[in-house]
UniProtKB/Swiss-Prot annotation:
CDD domains: TMP_TenI. One of its GO terms (cellular component) is cytoplasm. Pfam families: TMP-TENI (PF02581). Its EC number is 2.5.1.3. Mg(2+) binds at residues 69, 88. It catalyses: 2-[(2R,5Z)-2-carboxy-4-methylthiazol-5(2H)-ylidene]ethyl phosphate + 4-amino-2-methyl-5-(diphosphooxymethyl)pyrimidine + 2 H(+) = thiamine phosphate + CO2 + diphosphate; 2-(2-carboxy-4-methylthiazol-5-yl)ethyl phosphate + 4-amino-2-methyl-5-(diphosphooxymethyl)pyrimidine + 2 H(+) = thiamine phosphate + CO2 + diphosphate; 4-methyl-5-(2-phosphooxyethyl)-thiazole + 4-amino-2-methyl-5-(diphosphooxymethyl)pyrimidine + H(+) = thiamine phosphate + diphosphate. This is Thiamine-phosphate synthase. It comes from Haloarcula marismortui (strain ATCC 43049 / DSM 3752 / JCM 8966 / VKM B-1809) (Halobacterium marismortui).
Amino acid sequence: MVDWDVYLVTQASLSAGRTTDEIVAEAIESGVGVVQLREKNRTARERYELGQKLRELTREADVTFVVNDRIDLAQAIDADGVHLGDDDLPVSVARDILGDDAVIGRSVSTVEDAREAATAGADYLGVGAVFATGSKDDIDDEEYAVGTDRVAAIAEAVDIPFVGIGGITAGNATAVVDAGADGVAVITEITKADDPAAAAEALHSAVEQGR
């Protein structure tokens, strides 16, 4: 059973000198249920080596571990699954490669895309950006934020779990879950925090308040 409450996406460029595995280790002690290895600016070798460390940490803590985009890397480090975007292989192809037990996620921003991904066999969705975010260069603007109304519409449209992502903080996570999300996915809120464990705990509490 996957714990969707707080989902951490890694991004070392925001970590202010701390290692990603240090941040992840602290965060999973305080309520993070899913970790996604992202690190788009790292080489394949660097991601592989980091992924091995994160796989060990997450396995010991019984935390779900997925890899962004790279199905081959997910296989190489024995991740639980993969998270796919618009430019990645289709969900059905990932399923054929990784098998029925793999956890396969899909990023979506519209009701139509959410329905399509669910029909294709995605296990969960990442919906957003819910709010404006600075962690992705192309969506650092309010016009790209889908808002909690879109979250509510997607909750009505699909029966698979989904997390809201994009600009999520402990201050707005409750509203995202109240709108119908099963949890929240974050990069900055935990990665840039002085105390990642406390940040994860605050997010977990906010999610619980939204139920």
